[in-house]
Structures are given as structure tokens and as C-alpha cells.
Amino acid sequence: MTALPAASITSSAFDDLDALNAQLEGLHADQRVAWALQHGPQNAALSSSFGAQSAVTLHLLSQQRPDIPVILIDTGYLFPETYRFADALTERLKLNLKVYRPLVSRAWMEARHGRLWEQGMVGIDQYNNLRKVEPMRRALDELEVGTWFTGLRRSQSGGRAQTPIVQKRGERYKISPIADWTDRDVWQYLQAHDLPYHPLWEQGYVSIGDFHTTRRWEPGMREEDTRFFGLKRECGIHEDI
């Protein structure tokens, strides 16, 4: 696809999101980032789970705005490999990492509620709200984020299949610059820039969250089946905020 000149899309394009998304579909991912940084609301930030393919958006954003805040929600239940991966990428890309944690510790939450992730959909939803949604909402509010970049891709799950490049959530704009990328696009970008997958990728983990609700991919499974015992794909961050 021949990319349109980003300069031809002005700030007033936010007034018609359908038309804006149609125009942004014609841009390359780096052009989408540049356009959103120039024309989007003040205080841009990128959220990252430091998951399987997170190095793409971390590199894409940090190349254009090195000091952009990178929000990581530390649930307290991440894989040890995820913490080490976050350390390695933070050092390599000189990331401005902002770590947010739940208001209640692991031990206190389990004392109050037990192992919520083993209590069906109701328990999983409560767990996600306590350990993911609330800290992310707090991070976005405290950092006064007006333009929120994510690494969402349409091919990741059925629920993300219609992800637009830009959407409005309250007074905030949410930008997904690689929404239309395939797994091959991701691989090519990582190869081109000598960037790593998450260490657990080689062990069969294709979507990586908390250790107790993430499993290896096996033949016949969809990517979303590897999370939350196959009951759901989303943790609530990209549904409720």
C-alpha cells in the first residue's frame, strides 16, 4: 500500500473519527505515531505489558519520543521472565518506565478474597479490576494522559478484530498504531531492528500475562485460549477504560 502523506491529515480530523481512521489506514505505523504525537492531546503515554511482542511498540514510540512515559501494571503475579524482560528493554531502549501497582498487596487480597482467579468469571473479573484496571486508570489519571498509545492488534483475538487505529475513550484518545499488523509484520519488524521476543515465546507462550492465568499454546488452540483458562481474552483494561 502506498502511504498517504501524514501532513495532509490535520488536527481537525479528530472531529470525524470514522474518516480519520480511514485516512490513518493509509499510513505506515511510524507515520501514525508521528501524526498522533503532533496532533493528539497533550501528555502522551504508552502502556505495555512487556508481553510476547511488546518490543515493537516500545521501540516504535521511543524512537520518536524517547521520554514518553511507558506504563507497566505490576500485578504482583507476573512471570519472573517478564520482570527481567522489562529490565532488559528499559535499559536497552532507555525507557521512561512508570510502574503502577494495585493498592492492595497479593497477600492481603488473597486473605480477603481467596484465589480470585480460580473463582470463575466473577472472580476473574474482580481480580482483573483490583490488580489491573484500577492501577491503569490511576496511572492514566495521575499522568494526565490525553493520548494513550497501545500495542493492540486485530489479529490477536476475535474481540480485537475491529480495533480502530484511533478511538475516543472519555476525554482521552487511544491510539493503536499497529492495529492492522499480522504476526509476520511483527516478526519482520523485530528482525529488522534486532529486537527480542519475550523469553517465554520460545517455550510456546504466545500471549503472556500473569503466571496463574497464562498457559502455553498447543495445536488447535486459538491465541485467546491461552489466557484465563479459555474463558475470556481481555483483562478489562481495554474494555473498561
Swiss-Prot record:
Superkingdom in the source lineage: Bacteria
Catalyses which reaction(s): [thioredoxin]-disulfide + sulfite + adenosine 3',5'-bisphosphate + 2 H(+) = [thioredoxin]-dithiol + 3'-phosphoadenylyl sulfate
GO molecular function (one): phosphoadenylyl-sulfate reductase (thioredoxin) activity
Keyword terms of this UniProt record: Cytoplasm, Oxidoreductase
UniProt xrefs under Pfam families: PAPS_reduct
EC number(s) reported in the record: 1.8.4.8
Entry's localization field: Cytoplasm
InterPro entries, per the entry: PAPS/APS_Rdtase, PAPS_reduct_dom, PAPS_reductase_CysH, Rossmann-like_a/b/a_fold
SUPFAM superfamilies: Adenine nucleotide alpha hydrolases-like
GO terms of biological process kind: hydrogen sulfide biosynthetic process; sulfate assimilation, phosphoadenylyl sulfate reduction by phosphoadenylyl-sulfate reductase (thioredoxin)
NCBIfam families: cysH (TIGR00434), PAPS_reductase (TIGR02057), PRK02090.1 (NF002537)
Name by which UniProt lists this protein: Phosphoadenosine 5'-phosphosulfate reductase
Organism: Xanthomonas euvesicatoria pv. vesicatoria (strain 85-10) (Xanthomonas campestris pv. vesicatoria)
